[in-house]
């Protein structure tokens, strides 16, 4: 008995240590505050906690780990294991996914946005480019078409866009520039102050961001149907951290992505359903842009910017035409499925 007890004690300690080494906590860098845009990350954390009995958890930090424009850099050096970023913040670092920010692609809903994003994320060119930053594309943060809020008289004609100072990034910024506007790429967290101080006249956001970042509180009007495009914001993971996961934890992570996205889309749908009441509550006029104006905007922005993007990508050795064709074919399939 005297010789057995120490052995049992050693085995117990070894077992405890083995169990402890299985525990995994990932730091996740996002920004702003919890909102529709980050609900899939929170849902992913809940699912991982449930599936692993608390052995794999996410520590989600809003701005405490990095600035939003530096999240991809943080991933590259292993400062944290997971992060969200928007392609327009550093288009030169994530050229492939900027195909999803081209104006007037024709995406009509969040399900279609998920489909085209997944197709591009799975393309070898996207995988290879993100690997340069030690990043693996995990899932998108699908957003509806962007629309403007502004002060003063509504901008309802193409001539009204000339000289308009607008917060718009990526392909959207280029679209407004083609119409004579002056785009600025201040971050989402800076947009309210830029609008309040008069640095910009208008801000292009999806609905959740107008609400979360307060630009709707500055607005006199909102365009209901301009729909020039959207911004693509991936969630990525550090490759080293991903590959170091146990098989069980990696399976739990990969197997939770679709459910997290489904939750995100359903939650965002609830926001869209009550958007008209939000406008009424805040006294914001809903502006419908005429079809002629939208067609004129599309003629100035869509084809020229698309052609320039494809040529630029091909010149850099990236399959620009192939990526654009992938988006259009995937979108056609998604629309046919509905």
Predicted regions located by residue number:
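Bacterial N-terminal signal peptides that target proteins for export
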Residues: 1-9
């Amino acid at each position: 008995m005297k010789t057995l007890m120490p052995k049992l004690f050693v085995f117990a300690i070894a077992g405890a240590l083995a169990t402890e080494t299985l525990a995994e906590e990932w730091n996740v860098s996002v920004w702003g505050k919890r909102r529709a845009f980050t609900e899939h990350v929170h849902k992913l954390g809940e699912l991982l906690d449930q599936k692993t009995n608390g052995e794999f958890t996410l520590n989600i930090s809003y701005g405490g780990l990095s600035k939003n424009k530096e999240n991809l850099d943080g991933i590259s050096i292993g400062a944290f294991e997971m992060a969200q970023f928007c392609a327009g913040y550093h288009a030169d670092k994530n050229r492939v996914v900027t195909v999803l920010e081209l104006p007037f692609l024709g995406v009509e809903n969040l399900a279609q946005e998920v489909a085209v994003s997944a197709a591009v994320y799975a393309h070898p060119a996207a995988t290879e480019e993100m690997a340069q930053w030690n990043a693996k594309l995990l899932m998108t943060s699908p957003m509806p078409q962007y629309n403007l809020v502004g002060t003063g008289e509504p901008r309802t004609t193409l001539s009204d866009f000339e000289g308009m100072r607008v917060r718009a990034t990526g392909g959207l910024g280029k679209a407004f520039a083609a119409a004579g506007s002056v785009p600025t790429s201040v971050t989402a967290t800076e947009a309210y102050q830029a609008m309040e101080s008069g640095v910009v006249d208008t801000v292009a956001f999806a609905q959740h961001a107008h609400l979360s970042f307060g630009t709707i509180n500055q607005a006199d009007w909102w365009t209901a149907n301009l729909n020039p495009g959207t911004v693509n914001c991936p969630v990525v993971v550090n490759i080293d951290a991903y590959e170091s996961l146990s098989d069980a934890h990696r399976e739990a992570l990969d197997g939770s992505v679709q459910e997290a996205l489904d939750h995100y889309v359903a939650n965002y749908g609830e926001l869209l359903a009550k958007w008209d009441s939000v406008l009424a509550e805040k006294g914001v006029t809903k502006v419908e842009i005429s079809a002629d104006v939208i067609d004129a905007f599309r003629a100035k922005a869509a084809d020229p910017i698309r052609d320039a993007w494809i040529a630029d990508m091909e010149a850099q050795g990236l399959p620009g035409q192939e990526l654009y064709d992938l988006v259009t074919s995937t979108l056609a399939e998604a629309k046919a499925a509905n």
